[in-house]
Design a protein with these regions (language model features):
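Outer-membrane beta-barrel "beta-signal"
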Residues: 155-167
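Solvent-exposed loop/turn segments connecting transmembrane beta-strands
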Residues: 23-36, 60-67, 84, 147-156
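Membrane-embedded beta-strand positions of outer-membrane beta-barrel proteins
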Residues: 24-26, 51-53, 74, 88-94, ...
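Outer-membrane beta-barrel strand-turn architecture
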Residues: 41-45, 80-84, 129-133, 167
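Flexible, solvent-exposed loop segments that connect beta-strands
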Residues: 54-69, 96-118, 149-151
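Sec-dependent N-terminal signal peptides
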Residues: 3-14
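Outer-envelope beta-barrel architecture signal
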Residues: 4, 18-22, 45-49, 84-90, ...
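Transmembrane beta-barrel architecture of outer-membrane proteins
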Residues: 32-34, 69-73, 118-122, 156-158
Length: 167
């Protein structure tokens, strides 16, 4: 019976601590015409892990766009301050990305596109604001390096202005 009460108490206390977030990157949606969703789960008060999914909606021939058409990014964040509303973090991520790279045809007779899929390892830094009602705003910037393909871009950007909800 004691074990049952202990298990029930741990379950209730874990639900009382808001430790999950869902977010949408509004900067990507408004500026670059792409959608990025994120989910983040807190391990402790100063560390979390999450996953982001980026889908590029811009056409391939537009000059100002991400190179990647899709990118799935698992990440780990460590928070450096103990302030509950404003917090600074460092992030390590692995970005699995795919897209098309521009290839000039032999003889200069036009341009074609070659598909690629690659994995990037990178770091980012950022800050996060958490309102008492659960609203989340975070801003981050970082860069990763593609490791495997020769047809993929060398560097992968990780930029974002996320708005979301903690529950």
């Amino acid at each position: 019976m004691k074990k049952l009460f202990l298990a029930f108490g741990i379950l209730i206390s874990s639900l009382a601590y808001s430790q999950q977030e869902i977010k949408l990157d509004i900067a990507d949606a408004l500026i670059i015409r792409s959608i990025e969703f994120s989910y983040e789960n807190y391990l402790t008060e100063d560390s979390s892990f999450g996953i982001s999914a980026l889908f590029n909606l811009a056409k391939q021939d537009i000059t100002f766009r991400y190179n990647e058409n899709t990118m799935i990014t698992p990440y780990y964040r460590h928070y450096f301050s103990t302030n509950e509303q404003w917090n600074f973090f460092g992030e390590g991520f692995i970005g699995i990305n795919s897209g098309k790279t521009e290839v000039t045809n032999l003889g200069g007779s036009g341009v074609s596109y070659k598909k690629y899929t690659d994995g990037a390892l990178g770091v980012a830094v950022g800050t996060k604001y958490v309102a008492s009602g659960g609203l989340i705003i975070d801003l981050y910037a970082g860069v990763g390096r593609n490791l495997f393909g020769t047809d993929s871009p060398i560097l992968v950007p990780r930029l974002g202005l996320n708005v979301g909800w903690r529950f």
